[in-house]
Amino acid sequence: CLTEPGAGSEVGAVATKCFPTDTPGLYKIKGQKCFITSGDHDLASNIIHLVLAKTPDAKPGTAGINCLIVPKFWVNEDGSQDAWNDVTSTGIEHKMGIHGSSTLSLSFGENDNCYGWMIGDGPVEGRGKGMSQMFQMMNEERLNTGTFALGCIGSAYYAALDYTKIRKQSPKFTDPKGPSVRIIEHEDVRRMLMFQKAILEASRALLYSTYYY
């Protein structure tokens, strides 16, 4: 959870706070986040958030950011679900597309009872490691997004290819009085298929190269 009402591209402006408690590594969380992808849904019984926040003595800008694990519900040692962790959905974004994924605003600690675990050793003299930790995760997710996109492109191409082999429509351009033929035999359909395949193979090459380096 990165974006806030007052901190979008300027990540260093995050206002969400994390306050140390008597338990080492456990911090009280207070703040608002927005545009959070799959921030809340019914597909899982619990949601574990990675939250960017600053301690009261944090360095200004991105240097003072920390990354914390904040569950929607606490989990017992035996894996069973425990008490609610004061993480509240405060609004759903209405989008032009991507309706299969909920994008919403979240409030942490609205009832002053939200806690999270610091990832790593925590801040030293107000300097946190949250940005490097978050980008390590995000860089891997960017590759995963490319893999997902490649799968979608491939599925669309091969579905279209199969359809062109069974659908008959109109005679060939070179034989206007002849019988209807499979649409894969029409030059413009073949052109569109080749263009789609070129995008598919170029995307595959880009993804493989990115993974390699």
Segments predicted by a language model, with ranges:
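Glycine- and acidic
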Residues: 1, 30-36, 46, 86-92, ...
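A short core secondary-structure module
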Residues: 26, 30-84
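Glycine/proline-enriched, intrinsically flexible loops and inter-domain linkers
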Residues: 1-11, 66, 77, 86-87, ...
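Gly/Pro-rich turn-and-neighbor structural signature
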Residues: 1-27, 32-35, 186-213
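Short Gly/Pro-enriched turn/cap motifs at secondary-structure boundaries
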Residues: 6-9, 40-42, 59, 95-102
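A glycine-rich, basic-preceded beta-loop-alpha segment at the flavin cofactor/substrate interface
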Residues: 74-90, 95, 105-141, 161-184
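Extended amphipathic alpha-helical segments enriched in small hydrophobics
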Residues: 139-213
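Structured core elements
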Residues: 1, 15-19, 26-30, 35, ...
